Amino acid sequence: MCGGHMASDVKFQVKKATDEQVLIPATISEELEQKFVKKARSSSIKLIPISFIVAAVVLTILFLLVYFLKLLAISTIALFCIIFPIYAIYDAIATSKAIKNHDYEFFYGEIVNKNDNGNYQIKGLEEHKISVLFGKKEYNAGDKAIVARIKDDLNLISED
């Protein structure tokens, strides 16, 4: 989906950051919450056709390589092609389950910095690279931002 997955448990880290009061639980407008839920659902569903297209393209290229060059460059890449669509479907199901079970929450956090690939680090959640799901695209260090957590994904959202 959108955010980056890291080794340690996202919920645990969010709780720790909240306990240390570097993350403050946020109450957001009904409207913004609905927008978040819609966006989270659609971006997880969007991954499904993309994953099949990627898999089909890569498998076609592999097939042509094997057919014409008798190259057996299959292993890892083919495995990825099989796993990616399965993961995408799993992710979409997990996301809609999370929405149904209200497994999402919002916080006010402070931007620490932005890294090269456009993701942000938030105070207390430094090891996570957090991307913007919608709203404001550019943040500066020290800015306050709304951090949304759904399942183990973290995203930045804003009204504007």
Where are these regions (language model features)?
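Secondary-structure transition/turn motif
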Residues: 124-128, 159-160
